[in-house]
């Protein structure tokens, strides 16, 4: 039964993701996706790192050393936050320029994707319709068994399970058949889309000039990004210096204190 439940869960999840992929009306821009990912990642590191620092300072060794790491950590995260704010507009400009330079290529690829999407959409709709019908049939078959369980005694649980197992296996087999049918129907269109994408890149490769042009423009944008990021990175370096110096002084003081205690013994 666990295998049946897992199979159905995979089918539900796969179906929902596929529908989201084909019917997404308002996709995020490249910059928004990168920004969201970076924000989540940095915040996770910041929170987990602060937890570790707090735990260390609360330990016996941390209290003995008294490094004041938490104060340094807060200063460090504040410095990183300022740098991130400074780099935000610069990075946004980089992505905007890169998207502008590759607009023509992306439009052609999106056109190919939309054409293939229109061809496969009827198959996806038909699959969803059949899947809903199968679920309805399964619910109708299971409903009387649920009523039996409510009215019966505990000894009927095993009997109910014996009745449910073949129904679940039947639904699993029918679902597999529908998935296999959908896979066979979509296979030619997947190949078509793959061939179209390959043809687009082959045209770029044969054109030579276009490919070199894309590379040159990307290199130019990266160079401009590096130049504009220099002030923010310098601010980061200047902000880190007092933090590192403070940490260095605390560590040396702790070592000196430990040495004095050892000599006194």
Swiss-Prot record:
Cellular compartments per GO CC: chylomicron; extracellular vesicle; high-density lipoprotein particle; low-density lipoprotein particle; very-low-density lipoprotein particle
Which tissues and organs express this gene's product? Answer: Major protein of plasma HDL, also found in chylomicrons.
Q: A GO molecular-function term, please? A: phospholipid binding
Residues in the signal sequence: 1-18
Q: Which SUPFAM superfamilies match?
A: Apolipoprotein A-I
Q: In terms of domain of life, where is this protein from?
A: Eukaryota
Q: How is it modified after translation?
A: Glycosylated. Palmitoylated.
Q: Quaternary form?
A: Homodimer. Interacts with APOA1BP and CLU. Component of a sperm activating protein complex (SPAP), consisting of APOA1, an immunoglobulin heavy chain, an immunoglobulin light chain and albumin. Interacts with NDRG1. Interacts with SCGB3A2. Interacts with NAXE and YJEFN3.
* Name listed for the protein in its UniProt record: Apolipoprotein A-I
Q: What is the lineage of its organism?
A: Eukaryota, Metazoa, Chordata, Craniata, Vertebrata
């Amino acid at each position: 039964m666990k295998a049946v439940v897992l199979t159905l869960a995979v089918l539900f999840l796969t179906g929902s993701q596929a529908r989201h992929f084909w019917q997404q009306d308002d996709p995020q821009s490249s910059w928004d996706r990168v920004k969201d990912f970076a924000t989540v990642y940095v915040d996770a590191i910041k929170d987990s790192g602060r937890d570790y620092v707090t735990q260390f300072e609360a330990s016996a060794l941390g209290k003995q050393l008294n490094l004041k790491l938490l104060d340094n950590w807060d200063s460090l995260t504040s410095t990183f936050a300022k740098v991130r704010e400074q780099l935000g507009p610069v990075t946004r400009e980089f992505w905007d320029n890169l998207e502008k330079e590759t607009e023509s290529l992306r439009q052609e690829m999106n056109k190919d994707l939309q054409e293939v999407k229109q061809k496969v959409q009827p198959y996806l709709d038909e699959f969803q319709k059949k899947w809903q019908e199968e679920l309805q049939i399964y619910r109708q078959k299971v409903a009387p068994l649920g009523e039996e369980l409510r009215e019966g005694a505990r000894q009927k649980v095993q009997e109910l399970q014996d009745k449910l197992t073949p129904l679940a296996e039947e639904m699993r087999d029918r679902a597999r058949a529908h998935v296999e049918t959908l896979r066979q129907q979509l296979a030619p269109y997947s190949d078509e889309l793959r061939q179209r994408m390959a043809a687009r890149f082959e045209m770029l490769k044969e054109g030579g000039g276009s490919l070199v042009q894309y590379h040159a423009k990307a290199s130019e944008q990266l160079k401009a990004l590096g130049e504009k990021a220099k002030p923010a990175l310098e601010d980061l370096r200047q902000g880190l210096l007092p933090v590192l110096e403070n940490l260095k002084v605390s560590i040396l003081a702790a070592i000196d204190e430990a040495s004095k205690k050892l000599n006194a013994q």
